[in-house]
């Protein structure tokens, strides 16, 4: 009987030491700030975000994402599946976003459109890079403090 109690205590201790999100779901519980939008169009090129704190995404373990897009806030579902140790597929469901009129100039419309076109992610150099549909661009994110 004593052996079973010890084994039970060891099992509980080992479970407590496990990762906080299920294996293979590296986005869960992470928060990011947008630092730049890279377009494959020479006309647009790369646009640096002046205030990264105005454009954020938080990934929940419940497969929901929360966004700040300039002066608006929103949420969506997301689907992510690892394709390798540092990358995988990523798509967002329809984004429910408040509709406040943000002071101009604003990247609100461009960022919202791009989020709907995200198809994959990759971690590199401590950042999250989201690639868009048909390789049309990349959203570059840094960890939010």
Protein language model regions, located:
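Lipid interaction determinants
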Residues: 2-9, 17-145
């Amino acid at each position: 009987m004593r052996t079973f109690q010890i084994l039970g205590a060891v099992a509980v201790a080992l479970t407590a030491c496990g990762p906080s999100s299920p294996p293979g779901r590296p986005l869960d519980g992470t928060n990011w700030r947008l630092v730049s939008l890279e377009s494959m169009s020479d006309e647009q090129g790369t646009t640096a975000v002046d205030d990264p704190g105005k454009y954020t995404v938080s990934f929940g373990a419940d497969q929901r994402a929360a966004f700040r897009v300039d002066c608006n806030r929103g949420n969506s579902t997301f689907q992510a599946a690892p394709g390798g140790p540092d990358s995988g597929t990523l798509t967002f469901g329809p984004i429910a976003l408040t509709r406040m009129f943000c002071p101009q100039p604003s990247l609100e419309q461009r960022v919202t459109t791009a989020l709907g076109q995200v198809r994959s992610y990759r971690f590199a150099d401590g950042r999250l890079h989201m690639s868009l549909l048909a390789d049309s661009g990349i959203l570059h994110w840094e960890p939010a403090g």
